[in-house]
Swiss-Prot record:
Gene from which this protein is expressed: fusA2
Annotated compartments: Cytoplasm
Organism: Myxococcus xanthus (strain DK1622)
A GO MF label: GTP binding
NCBIfam families: EF-G, PRK12740.1-5, small_GTP
Residues annotated as domain tr-type G: 8-287
Name by which UniProt lists this protein: Elongation factor G 2
Gene3D superfamilies: 3.30.230.10, 3.30.70.240, Elongation Factor G (Translational Gtpase), domain 3, P-loop containing nucleotide triphosphate hydrolases, Translation factors
Described purpose of this protein according to its UniProt entry: Catalyzes the GTP-dependent ribosomal translocation step during translation elongation. During this step, the ribosome changes from the pre-translocational (PRE) to the post-translocational (POST) state as the newly formed A-site-bound peptidyl-tRNA and P-site-bound deacylated tRNA move to the P and E sites, respectively. Catalyzes the coordinated movement of the two tRNA molecules, the mRNA and conformational changes in the ribosome.
Record GO biological process: ribosome disassembly
Length: 691
């Protein structure tokens, strides 16, 4: 079967924002206007297409990133748009990270009342990291307090982004009727009676003309700056054509020089079709993003062009267990080069294993369309892969490549979980392992001292969802402990240590001997290991076993048994025996040397520090700041908001934030709100060990 749509008519986009900015509603409207669905769901009714999990519908939030294919007609052509609706809650930031890794462009949705909010800042920085071109949608222009210019100002000031207005709102709050198109210089008025399916173009009303002329002049200047020939025309006073402006803005957007801004109200069915036009006009096709880079198994640089006839390569960016396929694993892939066919075998270059692709599906949230092939530049899901994990590369075994893997943050909070009966013991461990495969920011470990199973995640809501899924999907009966801080440990000085494991039992013995240099690593770098053994005194395979022993020993630190982070290890000397040396002997020797070294390297306990933003009326500001100081918080700054409200930015230890929402409500008569996300780990006070 040949490719249905040429690659230049593909758009792989994400929809991202702060929680409650209207991402899922915007996605729902896009699906309706593209004909992918025939009835619009609403978040408050719990029946949207992309929020298909029970937990999402009950809470009215997006938890997982849902992938959907839709089609849009533009310039007399049909375009295929693969859309991923991502979560806005900070506990599910990892879902955004996974999606951005495989997207070509994004729509960032902002609330017209609040502008840039903490999580919109986080996802914007994540998109910067992956160099994803973006268009902006100022949503909720119908809300009381909606302010388009303020919102654009926050994009420019808080994000340092060059926001270029492509539209102005045609009225705001209850007078919001549509948008002013600054390219065509026309007013687009949306009909309330037809769910916004049609809009009329008309002349710009007199009261908006002056503002529209000024905004258009700014748009033309931004367009002219993207192209020398246009700059010359612009300076000579020659009118730029619509196509010239559109092409120049596209060039600036793809080069991350500027970010086109649109507006509307998704809930009131206004402004969504022009936003879809903008996806086609300003966001890249897979052909317009740089070729994907990776390494060969030998460590040499490798590149894959986005071509159907190139060697096959794809990245597994999401794993989920799907009841519709008898609970088989569903693996989401971004195909970067070549093509994938159902029934063929692929090579997992990270695991070094071959697996067969039994079935391919194209996703429509929780509905699946069976397909036989998936081509370069597309996103699809594979049924039944047993070995692939998030971030693994699937490729052609004759021309293997390992694509850059994803980094996942350390969990900050954990809870103990115990089966209610021995029958549930194995079931609970299997279920937790399957959930950990789906979500790399969720970890499972056993406390060696107590034997308790601990599950760790990015926040209370994250773990609440995990527990809820255990009980409902996997039918596990368990006792759940109270949330606790996920402390970590590290070393603060450098130590050299010898590790020996020698056993003689009459037959073949065991001999492992290694010297390690253990030192602090850069914050956030995790565990790193370097082989500096020279002269062949210890072979590479035995040094690899030493590395495995060290990595295993990292799971239980010397201070209080918490996992260790940010430790750098160098193997620099040792010896081996011609007969008795084995990988297991060197693994044990490495583990012994590491444990002795970290005990001597002045180990410390680390606690998670959170970035908090508290939005409070002026009247309660003194009380709120005093309370933060009492929680060992450090105020970083304050930003005035409209209506005698202040946004306080602070860094506070997570240990001091349990129960904070209840305290804040009582201090502010229920009028203050806060958001919190992980910042970094820092040394904990000695009193933390006594808790």
């Amino acid at each position: 079967m040949a490719r249905e749509y040429p690659l230049d008519r593909y758009r792989n986009i994400g929809i991202m924002a702060h929680i409650d900015a209207g991402k899922t509603t915007t996605t729902e409207r896009i699906l309706f206007y593209t004909g992918a669905i025939h009835r619009m769901g609403e978040v408050h009714e719990g029946n949207t297409t992309t929020d298909w999990m029970v937990q999402e519908r009950e809470r009215g939030i997006t938890i997982t990133s849902a992938a959907i294919s839709a089609f849009w007609a533009r310039h007399d052509q049909r375009y295929r748009v693969n859309i991923i609706d991502t979560p806005g809650h900070v506990d599910f930031t990892i879902e955004v990270e996974r999606s951005l890794r495989v997207l070509d462009g994004a729509i960032t949705v902002f609330d017209a009342v609040n502008g840039v909010e903490p999580q919109s800042e986080t996802v914007w920085r994540q998109a910067d990291k992956y160099k994803v071109p973006r268009i902006c949608f100022i949503n909720k222009m119908d809300r009381v307090g909606a302010d388009f210019e303020m919102s654009v100002g926050t994009i420019r000031e808080k994000l340092g982004a060059r926001a270029v207005r492509m539209q102005l709102p045609l009225g705001a709050e209850d007078k919001h009727r549509g948008v002013i198109d600054l390219l065509k210089m026309k007013a687009l008025v949306f009909q309330d009676s037809e769910q916004g399916s049609h809009y009329e173009e008309s002349d710009i009303p007199e009261e908006f003309k002056e503002a529209a002329d000024a905004a258009r002049a700014e748009l033309l200047e931004a367009a002219a700056e993207q192209d020398d020939a246009l700059t010359e025309k612009f300076l000579e006073g020659v009118e730029l054509t619509e196509d010239e402006v559109r092409g120049a803005i596209r060039k600036g957007c793809l080069g991350l020089k500027l970010f086109p801004v649109f507006c509307g109200s998704a809930f009131r069915h206004k402004g969504v079709q022009p936003l879809l036009d903008a996806v086609v006009d300003y966001l890249p096709s897979p052909l317009e993003v740089p070729p994907i880079h990776g390494k060969t198994p030998n460590g040499e640089d490798a590149v894959r062009e986005t071509r159907d006839d190139a060697p096959f390569s794809a990245l597994a960016f999401k794993i989920m267990n799907d009841p519709a396929f008898q609970s088989q694993t569903l693996t989401f892939l971004r195909v970067y080069s070549g093509k994938l066919e159902a029934g063929t075998a692929v090579w997992n270059s990270v695991k070094g294993k071959r697996e067969r692709i039994s079935r391919l599906v194209q996703m429509r949230a929780d509905k699946k369309d069976e397909i036989t092939e998936c081509y370069a530049g597309d996103i699809c899901a594979v049924v039944g892969l047993k070995l692939a994990g998030t971030g693994d590369t699937l490729c052609d075994d004759k021309q293997p490549i390992i694509l850059e893997r994803m980094d996942f943050p350390e969990p900050v909070i954990d809870i103990a979980i115990e089966p209610k009966s021995t029958a549930d013991q194995d079931k609970i461990l299997q279920s937790l392992q399957r959930l950990a495969m789906e979500d790399p920011s969720f970890r499972v470990r056993t406390n060696e001292e107590t034997g308790q199973t601990l599950i760790a995640g990015m926040g209370e809501l994250h773990l609440e969802i995990i527990v809820d899924r255990l009980l409902r999907e996997f039918k596990v009966d368990a006792n759940i402990g109270k949330p606790q801080v996920a402390y970590r440990e590290t070393v603060t000085t450098q130590v050299e240590m010898e590790g020996k494991y020698i056993r003689q039992t009459g037959g073949r013995g065991q001999y492992g001997h290694i010297w390690l240099r253990v030192a602090p690593n850069e914050p956030g770098k995790g565990f790193s290991f370097e082989n500096k053994v020279t002269g062949g005194v210890v072979s590479k395979e035995f040094v690899d076993a030493v590395k495995a022993g060290c990595a295993e020993a990292m799971q239980n630190g010397p201070v209080a048994g918490y996992p260790m982070v940010d430790v750098k290890v160098e193997a620099f000397d040792g010896s081996m025996h011609d007969v008795d040396s084995s990988e297991i002997a060197f693994k044990i020797a490495g583990s012994l040397a590491f444990k002795d070294a970290v005990r001597m390297a002045t180990p410390v306990l680390l606690e998670p520090i959170m970035n908090c933003e508290i939005v409070t009326p002026d009247d309660f500001m003194g009380d709120v700041i005093g309370d933060l100081n009492g929680r060992r918080g450090k105020v970083q700054g304050m930003t005035p908001r409209p209506g005698r409200v202040q946004a306080i930015q602070a860094q506070v230890p997570l240990a001091a934030m349990f129960g904070y929402s209840t305290d804040l409500r009582s201090r502010s008569q229920g009028r203050a709100t806060y958001t919190m996300q992980f910042s970094h780990y820092a040394p904990a006070p000695k009193t933390a060990l006594n808790r």
